[in-house]
Amino acid sequence: MSASAGAGFASSETDVAVVGGGAAGLYVALRAAEQGARVTLVSRKPLAESASYWAQGGLAAALAPDDSPARHADDTLNAGRGLCRAAAVEALTRHAAAAVAELRERGVRFDTDRNGGLSLALEGGHSARRIVHAGGAQTGRAITGRLAELVAANPGVEVLEETSAVALWSDGSRCAGVVTEAGAIGARATVLATGGGAALWLRTTNPWGAIGAGAVLAHAAGAAVADLEFCQFHPTALALPGDERDGTLLTEALRGEGAKLLDASGSRFTDELAPRDQVTAAILDRIEADHTDHVHLDLRPISPEGFPNVFATCRASGLDPECEPVPVAPAAHYVMGGVVCDLDGRTTLPGLYAVGECACTGLHGANRLASNSLTECFVFGARVSAAAASAMDSGGPVPLPEWRFEPPTEATREAVWRRAGPRRDATGLEELCDDPYPLARMIARAALERRESRGPHRRSDYPSRQPELDGVHFVIGADGSTRRERWT
């Protein structure tokens, strides 16, 4: 095959190597196997124990009689603050309903209303009810659990659980597979589905493994990355006294059903259903004005039966959401940037594909619309699986790389939160450029280059949005240089 392992190093071959066991990785592995490819799925954790598992919201799809893909697209473009790639938005919104239908056919049980139709929730930034969910706020668990069952039952997929990728098998000109702790896997196509990097910030809603490994692996192998200055901070994560790290997510759907944000005086201060960057900014302004570290989310207007796990989580933290509002503050939630790829997942490095949160197609622009991310996994996952399954071997042997991935330290997480958090400036970002973790440095460089405030990227030294940067993406190439690109 195209890969070449050194003496004494275990190696194997497959058609498609998928790195990541969340929703995107499971789906791509399943679809590629169904198209006749031999698939090896590498998962750092047991199947389905990923960030996708914890997704509370749902899938956004225009299914209601008064809704349409065009309306969904308008909401996505509005949330994206002038940076969405129109072709990606059109692809997602046009095929979202079909993705939901396929998941139902595969056995995912979504919540239904009293008439047996899909129950559609409302979330911030959406102009219509279009969020399909399962178990109230356990959508990720329902989807990844079912996909894991289907993958385990498919003989075309070899699953390597609790196995970490430490490098991509690349010579800088093409990717020939993946290197794991246990050995090297040669592949015609390698698909990164490693999730995002929001756990690189100290206060996060993500599991601690969400450290942006995909972007680091890809860039080290020779692929370009982009839009890394944009990390979405979810407005409503629990803010428990004395615990700066806790970022337990309280789903946006709570506000869609009537939960209210209150300041220190008990007054409402913002539109709870505005896009996330707008709500987060309002909360941060109010926290600063009130000289506190949180605001409150009043859950008393909604029924506990609709969100049993949310109310249980609050009670487990010593809170009584049925009697009094709970403390919340923003936490890092989703990185819009990642590995640059087209709508079929092809990166700038031949042989390497990316899908899900680790990918950067330009779909989300500067600010992701709520619940578009799970939909993205399936709409674009279908395209990526087809492209990867049909990929052809394209060259001779590739030597194993010497570079190996090293995770970030606790000091890096603290530095990223304090210097590239919801509020940032040149001084802090320049300090972060010296961090030992590659992704922290790339985030800082991209944020320094974008001399404006847009979406969740808010610089106190450049507080205004600059119209001349509409549609401009800051891309960091394999050689480390930063360039500006406009994507169509």
Task: Report the location of each language-model feature.
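Glycine- and aromatic-enriched mobile tails/lids
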Residues: 3-14, 23, 31, 35-37, ...
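Conserved N-terminal glycine-rich FAD pyrophosphate-binding loop of Rossmann-like flavoproteins
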Residues: 45-77, 81, 245-246
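Core beta-strand elements of the Rossmann-like FAD/NAD(P) dinucleotide-binding domain
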Residues: 12-14, 181-189, 348
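An anion/pyrophosphate-binding glycine-rich loop and adjacent beta-alpha core
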Residues: 47, 217, 223-326, 378, ...
